């Protein structure tokens, strides 16, 4: 369907269903409108699983280009959150990040403080995507306010922070899509553009 995109090996990792909110969040979230509801805090364990178990296995079993430049991570919604976190924690191993519809507003302050302590690499490639009609029923239980704007603001904050901390502008691409909702259809539509952006710097 997209013959112009470079050949690559894609590894898709199943999430843990309802527990994905734990494994994709590096920090605990305790501000739900539902009394007693909290989640998150297992993102570090998930990141270690990906980088210490999954990646070495794939590199051993398949003919990969295992260097940083040819290693990418892409995630949507909460998967975007853990992609942002791992992009900081494993910046020496992950050269490309695809952050789709990140729900980072769930722990924006914690992420910003963590990012402030990191030294970013100017050559890390980061593709950011967000729609103007983001939000789902779960979001409404977690935040009282304009959720659609929260998605946009969080993505813009990440974009500005990357620039402010020295990532070259040519290595960042942001796409805000008018009318796009929080779903797989929108993410699939924009995935080819993300992959092309990554491959521009591949040898």
Per-range role (PLM):
Residues 1-203:
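Non-catalytic cap/lid and distal C-terminal segments of serine-dependent acyl enzymes
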């Amino acid at each position: 369907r997209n013959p112009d995109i470079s050949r690559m090996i894609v590894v898709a990792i199943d999430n843990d269903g309802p527990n994905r909110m734990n494994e994709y969040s590096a920090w605990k979230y305790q501000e739900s409108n539902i009394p007693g509801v909290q989640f998150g805090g297992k993102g570090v364990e998930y990141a270690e699983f990906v980088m210490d178990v999954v990646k070495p296995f794939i590199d051993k079993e398949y003919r990969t280009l295992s260097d940083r430049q040819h290693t990418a991570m892409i995630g949507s919604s909460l998967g975007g959150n853990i992609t942002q976190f791992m992009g900081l924690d494993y910046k020496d191993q992950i050269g490309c990040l695809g952050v789709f519809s990140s729900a980072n507003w769930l722990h924006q302050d914690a992420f910003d403080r963590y990012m402030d302590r990191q030294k970013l690499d100017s050559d890390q490639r980061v593709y950011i995507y967000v729609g103007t009609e983001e939000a789902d029923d779960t979001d409404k239980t977690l935040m009282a306010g304009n959720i659609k704007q929260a998605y946009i603001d969080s993505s813009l904050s990440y974009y500005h922070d990357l620039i402010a901390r020295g990532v070259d502008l040519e290595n960042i691409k942001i796409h805000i899509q008018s009318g796009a909702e929080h779903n797989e259809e929108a993410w699939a539509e924009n995935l080819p553009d993300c992959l092309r952006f990554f491959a521009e710097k591949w040898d």
